[in-house]
């Protein structure tokens, strides 16, 4: 089997909280790739059902009956400690626990899964979607993250890419990607704001674009605000209304909650286009008096009232972003709306009130981020020329110094990549070591900021307090991921770390997860192969029985008996749930005997041609196409020119090569 050439394309993936999307550059244009289910976006949902792992639409379809094993909105947990996500935990039906180092883990059937592993399953789906379209393996990607993701969340997203078998060439913020998609063909200089309200996060970025240069001036946001929160206010309202009507609390019923979640999302979407919507959930629960039905009417005005606090929370980040960019609202030429929640009329009114202008609705809020990621992939791959992206870090980075103070080395909204150095010293006489505690945030005291890493610089030569010269260097790469080093000038001793963050995965954990992903890939392949073999065997039995029924009067009785025996043999291996090879062998043996029908029929036709009376006596007039239908083989013989069989074999071979090919 020849080894398939890997694609030179760097795909762009928008790994969203609610939905994900994949795009690729083709002929100088970014193209969104349609999934195997025929959709341009895929639900970011992973479910475990028996021995199967379901991703996307199949996972979403069974969520109501399998809520505790269906993992949705897991992006809200990636790169975070369990203690940081208490509000999010209350909104999901699956079990969220604290791992050995305080990380978030999900518990399903007694097994722990990290957010990175679940994200990797969605990324694998995106990767396979691109591979099916391009017809060759894909190994490189640009993945987007919310602009206000901190260092550990970015690093964890990159780790998810590695687990999925992707070399993540760049992590870029979602608003920046949207700006790339918007401005790639625009002439002249513009200052734009990107208002990105997605399923789990809110970002606002201010950019200056012109002559192919995309410079981020500032960014702000709220990683605890998104469409899920808008769903939640509707869910709470439905629970309260139902309790008033029936005296039953649905908040403890996971299956009912999943139905309410689906109903809330549907109502929210409908209210962007209509002024009121009916919510009907028959048989939502039951008590001693019988089944209970939930029937409510929600108006747009009441929904906006329920969500007023959430809408208000989008304003302050916008004002801060403008202030950091040293601009006023009147300086902004255009406001882009990104994320599904930006379709809500009340959100658009908030944007209009902040910036004093109608927002631009010319981009598809669900696809624009993936398109921008593909453009960045094109820039990195040399396919897109004369584009320069200057991004910034969203939060200040520094270290803890004497008195528990946060001393920033890199201020927020600093353009990246960048390197900053600063000299520090010891706090005590003859201090032999220092602990470098790396922080991210805007608060003056260390304890109020997020600790994203720590390491020790040891064997400092004895010296009075304040004498040792310890140079701390912060090096931030284009992905916004931090590398820190500390060097003692006297001894030349140096210590370096890549900030994996206190809630980042260690290298051995990543390797284990990569291996697990490969193992599941193999298991899924075997399950699919078994399913295909059983389906083919069933189909073969049907064809064989139909052929006997149609032609038994025109073929030898001994052949009929042989075929019936082979049919029974195939039935037996199916009933016994025999291994795939046994099923295939039995099917192929039946197929070989079915081909004898064709031979017998051709012989019969030859005899009929010799005597014109044969047709008058009712002998069938058989054509070649009829024979082909009934002599179908699970594997076409060498040299078979039937295009359908030939194509099927080529497809199957390509699939095997893609699945088996080791990740680079």
Curated annotation (Swiss-Prot):
Organism: Chlamydia caviae (strain ATCC VR-813 / DSM 19441 / 03DC25 / GPIC)
Transmembrane segments: none
Biased composition regions of type Basic and acidic residues, renumbered to the chain: 578-592
Name of the coding gene: dnaK
Protein name, per record: Chaperone protein DnaK
Region Disordered, annotated ranges: 516-538, 578-664
Positions with biased composition (Low complexity): 600-617, 638-649
Protein origin, superkingdom: Bacteria
Modified residues (Phosphothreonine): 201
Gene3D superfamilies to which the protein is assigned, alphabetical: 1.20.1270.10, 3.30.420.40, Actin, Chain A, domain 4 (3.90.640.10), Substrate Binding Domain Of DNAk, Chain A, domain 1 (2.60.34.10)
InterPro entries per record: ATPase_NBD, Chaperone_DnaK, Heat_shock_70_CS, HSP70_C_sf, HSP70_peptide-bd_sf, Hsp_70_fam
An example molecular function term from Gene Ontology annotations: ATP-dependent protein folding chaperone
A UniProt-annotated Pfam family: HSP70
Chaperone listed as a keyword: yes
């Amino acid at each position: 089997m020849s080894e398939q050439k890997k694609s030179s394309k760097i795909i762009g993936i928008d790994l969203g909280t609610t939905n994900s999307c994949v795009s690729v550059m083709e002929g100088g244009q970014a193209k969104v790739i349609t999934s195997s289910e025929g959709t341009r976006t895929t639900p970011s949902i992973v479910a475990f059902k028996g021995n199967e792992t379901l991703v996307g639409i199949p996972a979403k379809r069974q969520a109501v009956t399998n809520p505790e094993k269906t993992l949705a909105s897991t992006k809200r947990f990636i790169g975070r400690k369990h203690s940081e996500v208490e509000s999010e935990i209350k909104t999901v039906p699956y079990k969220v626990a604290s791992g050995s180092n305080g990380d978030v883990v999900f518990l399903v059937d007694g097994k722990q899964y990290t957010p990175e592993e679940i994200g990797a399953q969605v990324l694998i789906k995106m990767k396979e979607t691109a591979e099916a379209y391009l017809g060759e393996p894909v190994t490189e990607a640009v993945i987007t993250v919310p602009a206000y993701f901190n260092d550990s969340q970015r690093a964890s997203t990159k780790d998810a890419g590695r687990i999925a078998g992707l070399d993540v060439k760049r992590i870029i913020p979602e608003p920046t990607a949207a700006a790339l998609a918007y401005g790639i063909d625009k002439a002249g200089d513009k200052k734009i704001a990107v208002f990105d309200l997605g399923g789990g996060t809110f970002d606002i970025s201010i950019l200056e674009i012109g002559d192919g240069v995309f410079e981020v001036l500032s960014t702000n946001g709220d990683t605890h605000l998104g469409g899920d929160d808008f769903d939640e206010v509707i869910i709470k309202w439905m629970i309260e209304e139902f309790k008033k009507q029936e005296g039953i609390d649905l908040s403890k019923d996971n299956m009912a909650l999943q139905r309410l979640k689906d109903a809330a999302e549907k109502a929210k979407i409908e209210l962007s286009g209509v002024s009121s919507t009916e919510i009907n959930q028959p048989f939502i629960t039951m008590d001693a008096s019988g089944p209970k039905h939930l029937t409510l009417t929600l108006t747009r005005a009441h929904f906006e009232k329920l969500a007023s606090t959430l809408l208000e929370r989008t304003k302050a980040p916008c004002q801060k972003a403008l202030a950091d960019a040293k601009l006023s609202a009147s300086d902004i030429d255009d406001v882009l709306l990104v994320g599904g929640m930006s379709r809500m009329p009340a959100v658009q009114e908030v944007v209009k009130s902040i910036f004093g202008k109608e927002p631009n609705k010319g981009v598809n809020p669900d696809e624009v981020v993936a398109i921008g990621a593909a453009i960045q992939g094109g820039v990195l791959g040399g396919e897109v020329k004369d584009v320069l992206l200057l991004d910034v870090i969203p939060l200040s980075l520094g270290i803890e110094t004497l008195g528990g103070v946060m001393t920033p080395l890199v201020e927020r909204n600093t353009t990246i990549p960048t390197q900053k150095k600063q000299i520090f010293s010891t706090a005590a006489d003859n201090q032999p070591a220092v602990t470098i505690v790396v922080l991210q945030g805007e608060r003056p005291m260390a304890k109020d900021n997020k600790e994203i890493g720590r390491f020790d610089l040891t064997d400092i030569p004895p010296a009075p307090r304040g004498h040792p010269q310890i140079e701390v260097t912060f090096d931030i790469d284009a992905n916004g991921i931090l590398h820190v080093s500390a060097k003692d000038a006297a001894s030349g001793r140096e210590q370096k770390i890549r900030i994996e963050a206190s809630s980042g995965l260690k290298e051995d954990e990543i390797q284990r997860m990569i291996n697990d992903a490969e193992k599941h890939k193999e298991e899924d392949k075997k399950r699919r192969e078994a399913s295909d073999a059983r389906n083919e065997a069933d189909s073969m039995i049907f064809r064989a029985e139909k052929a006997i029924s149609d032609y038994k009067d025109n073929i030898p009785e001994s052949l009929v008996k042989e075929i019936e025996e082979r049919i029974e043999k195939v039935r037996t291996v199916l009933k016994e749930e025999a291994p795939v090879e046994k099923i295939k062998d039995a099917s192929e043996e039946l197929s070989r005997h079915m081909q004898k029908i064709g031979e017998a029929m051709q012989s019969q036709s030859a005899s009929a041609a010799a005597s014109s009376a044969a047709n008058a006596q009712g002998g069938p007039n058989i054509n070649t196409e009829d024979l082909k239908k009934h002599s179908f083989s699970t594997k076409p013989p060498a040299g078979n020119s039937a295009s359908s069989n030939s194509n099927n074999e080529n497809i199957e071979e390509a699939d095997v090569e893609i699945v088996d090919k080791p990740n680079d």
